[in-house]
Amino acid sequence: MGLSMAPKGKYEQSHWAIKVLQWVGSVLLLSMFAAGSIFFFEQPLSINALKWVQFIQSTAMFLLPPLCMAYLWSKQPLDWLKVKGERLKVKGESLWAVMLMLVALPAINLLGHLNQQMTLPTFLEPLEQWMKTSEESAKVLTEQFLNVTTFGGLMINILLMALLPAVGEELTFRGVLMNLFRVKGKRLKVKGEGVPHLAIWCSAILFSAIHMQFYGFVPRMLMGALFGYMLVWTGSLWIPILMHFTNNAMAVILYFVALREGWDMEQVDAIGTNDTLWLGIVSMVITIVGIYAFRRSTTMSNASSRISSGN
């Protein structure tokens, strides 16, 4: 039976392992179709063609599978994904989320700098060399994508490198995978409140690993965990999506401005490290305090809402 004919929530009661297989199968199947898109462009691929391929592959891997799975696994798919319309009404939480990501930029740079100091044992030298080569290849391709100086090119890059990954990856890692891990894993208790730590950290590790950028693994994993906790605290996937978008869009816009103004991008990336190490430390402290304050604020707000509703 085709997806269009399948009733909502048809596999809602399916075993956890069956759902995992369905999700993996949908990703593989759609990715295979997306991979075929490369043959519709002239070879060798131009940067514009590569951007089209990236758009198609990102949509196939991260955007469509979560939507399909949510439809098959729940009678209320948007609510299951935590993206239902009323969840947009998050008041000041959106501003909190954006400010946190802006303040955290030097701290993210510092964590990335520390991550890059990682060295593997001598017997793993071939693996380390492969990791460095992969990292450099990814960096070169990213810089080619970002190498635009027109506002039209900037808008395309924001769509391709900020908006699409933010929506697709959050639907995948916080929407689907965190839900699956949450069902399978045992809930740990923190001060009497159920918080799915296992689900949050497992999805965060996979989120970082899928990028195949090993020297940025730690900061990306920590961001993934933060996005997971934000989802739990607010009950809305739109907050992690907004934070993810803010982080990616900042990088795209900074690179664009650097090209137009002739800035040294390496110095921009080094903010919070070396000569500005103090800024990275201050940023980290403010970010941690901000996260704690956000959690207290949302906890109190949720408690107030429950009292007002008579629960």
PLM feature spans:
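Transmembrane alpha-helical segments in integral membrane proteins
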Residues: 63-74, 154-181, 286-297
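C-terminal membrane module of polytopic membrane proteins
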Residues: 245-311
